[in-house]
Amino acid sequence: AVAVDGRPADLPSALAVPADADRETAAQRRVADWFFAVLVGAQVLLAVAVLPLLRRARRHAGPVGPAPVPRRVVATVELLLIAAALAVPAALLADVVPWWRGDHAGAWFAVVTLLLVAGGTAAVRFAPGHAATLGPLGAVAGLATLVVGADVLTGARLQLNGVVGYSALEGGRFAGLGTVGLGVFVAGSLLCAGWLAQRVPRGWRPVVVVAVGGIAVVVVGSPYLGADSTGAIALTAGVSVAAAISTGGWLTVSRLVWAAMAGLAATVGFAVVDLRRPPAERGSLGRFLAALGDGTGGLTVHRASGANFQTLVDSPLTVLALAAALLVWFALLQPWGGLKRLFGIYPAMRAAMAGTAVAAVLAGLLGGSALDVAGAAGALVVPMAALAALRVLDHSTDRTRPDDGGPANGRLLAAPRRPADDELPAGPGAGDGTADGGTAHDGAATPGSTPDPAARASTGAATT
C-alpha cells in the first residue's frame, strides 16, 4: 500500500472518517424534521405575541390614550425576536461541534444551538449602537451573512450533512450553498446593503447597494464558492430592484428597465461561464441551456415543476413563508403596524426588503425549491422588521428642537405639557390656552403672531 498525502496512513483511521459522516447524515435526517417544526412554531407564536404590542407601541403625546407597553415587556420581546432571527445561523454553526457522536444526538444539537443563539443574542444586545432603531437589524444581518459566507468561503463543510444544509445521501448537492443557506445569505446580504446605504448620502445609496450586492452575487454564483448560478441570477434581480429604489420613490419604468438590463447581463455572464465548464461539472443553469440545445429542455422544465410542487406541499418552510407573508400584509403594513413608517423614514431598508422578497421567490422557483428559500429568508427578515417597526412606533411622538430659525438638530423633547389654570398669566387670552402675544401653549401660533423658536417643534420621528 502507498500512503497518499492528506489521507490517513492506517486503515482504522481511514474507515473512521466515512463512518463518522454516516452517523452525521443519519442524525441530520432525524433532527432536521423536528428542528424546522420547532422553528416554524416558535416564529408563528412570536408573530402572534407581537400583534398586541404593535397596537400599543405608539406612545400618545396627549393626556388621554391607552397605557403604553411596559419597557421590560418590550425589551423581552426584542430579545426573543433577535433570538428567532439567529436560530438558523446558530443551527448551521452548531455543526462545528460533533454533536452527532453522542447517544442522544438530538438533545446535544438542541443544547449547542441554544447556547449559540444565547451568545449571538447577547452579542447583538451589548453591541455598540443597539439603542438605535436599526441597530439590532444591522447586527443580526451582519452575523447571519458572516456565518453563511464564512462557511461558503471555507468549502461549505457545515452545510454538507448539516441540519440546515443538505444531505449527501439525497445526491442533489455536494458542495456550495444549500436552499436554507441561500435564503439566509440573500436576506442577510441585502439587509446589510440597505443598512449601510442608509448611513450614506442619498446619491451614494445605489452605489453601496450594488457594491455589497455584487460581492454577494459573486459568492453565490461562483463555481468555486456557492456554485448556484440560478441563485445568483435571482440575487442579481433583487440587488437591481433594491438599488433602483434605494433613494426613495417607486419602481418607475426607467428604473425597471435598468434593473432588467442588469439582471439580463448577469444571466448571460453566468450562462457563458457555466456552459464553458465540463458537462459533469455544470450547474443547473448550464444543464438547462445544454438541454435546450439538444431538444430535451421540456423534460428539465417538467422535472423542475414537479420538484417545486412536491416541495411546496411537503416542506415546513412553506408554512413559515406563508405565515411571514400574512404577518407582513395584515399587520406590519397596516397603518398601526409601523412598517410603512419605517419605510418612509428609512427608504434604503424598504429597498433591501423588497429586493429580498424578489430574490427569494425567484431563487426558489428557478431552483425547484418552491418557497423554501423565501421561508429561510423570512425567518431572518420578518423578526427584524417587526423589531424595527416596534422601535419606530415607540419614537412616533418624539420631538426635535430646531435651532433658531434653522433645521432640527435631533435633540429629543418630551410632549408639551398644558399648564394648569392657576399657572396661566393674567391678561388677554388667559384661561383659553394662549398667553400674551397670541402664542399657544401647545406650540401653535395664532394669526398675526410670531411663535417662540422653542415652540416650533418638529413632529418627525427620531433619527438614528
Positions of the model-derived regions?
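Hydrophobic cores of alpha-helical transmembrane segments in multi-pass inner/ER membrane proteins
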Residues: 42-50, 110-128, 176-196, 234-248, ...
